[in-house]
């Protein structure tokens, strides 16, 4: 039969919450709230920090490409949860790391020179870390997608059209997510 691991199994109240697969699940004011766990946020922050440290002498183009590979995938994984505040927090942490990276590269230049070299105005945002070809993906631009509930009065055997339509929508959303992830891995994030 099924055996539960003693060290991995935790019994907790839903109001206290628990972490599972990078998410924190908790009931708050009668509603189930699912958001990225603190452990998951620390892990991606550490990973991006390592990328920046490993690429201290790399061009801005290469750095943007490597960071986008990680952030687009992470944002796609968490975009169906309550992640907007987490996305904003991580974008701010990445901005701070990139500011330190740019100051280390040019210790004798003033901040205005550094800003003009690495940050440009793009779509109304003055502080966009971008090169001539690439732009840093901001997780807060990722739309939060709420999953629709299945209608309880539908029968999968009788209402085939309803379930086929749901499946088609699901396939299209997965394809869109895969394409945006693939583009980021290739270093293309549209300007």
PLM region spans:
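Non-catalytic terminal/accessory segments
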Residues: 1-191
């Amino acid at each position: 039969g099924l055996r539960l691991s003693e060290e991995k199994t935790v019994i907790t109240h839903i109001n206290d919450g628990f972490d599972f697969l990078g998410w924190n699940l908790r009931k708050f004011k009668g509603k189930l709230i699912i958001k990225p766990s603190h452990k998951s946020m620390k892990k991606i922050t550490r990973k991006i920090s390592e990328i920046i440290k490993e690429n201290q002498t790399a061009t801005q183009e290469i750095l943007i490409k490597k960071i986008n590979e990680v952030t687009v995938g992470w944002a796609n994984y968490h975009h169906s949860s309550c992640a907007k505040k987490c996305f904003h927090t991580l974008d701010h942490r990445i901005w701070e790391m990139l500011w330190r990276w740019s100051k280390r590269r040019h210790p004798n230049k003033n901040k205005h020179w550094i800003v003009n070299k690495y940050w440009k105005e793009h779509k109304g945002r003055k502080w966009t870390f971008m090169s001539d070809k690439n732009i840093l993906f901001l997780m807060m631009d990722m739309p939060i997608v709420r999953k629709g509930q299945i209608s309880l009065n539908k029968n999968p055997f009788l209402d085939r059209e309803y379930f086929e339509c749901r499946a088609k929508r699901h396939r299209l959303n997965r394809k869109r997510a895969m394409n945006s992830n693939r583009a980021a891995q290739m270093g293309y994030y549209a300007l």
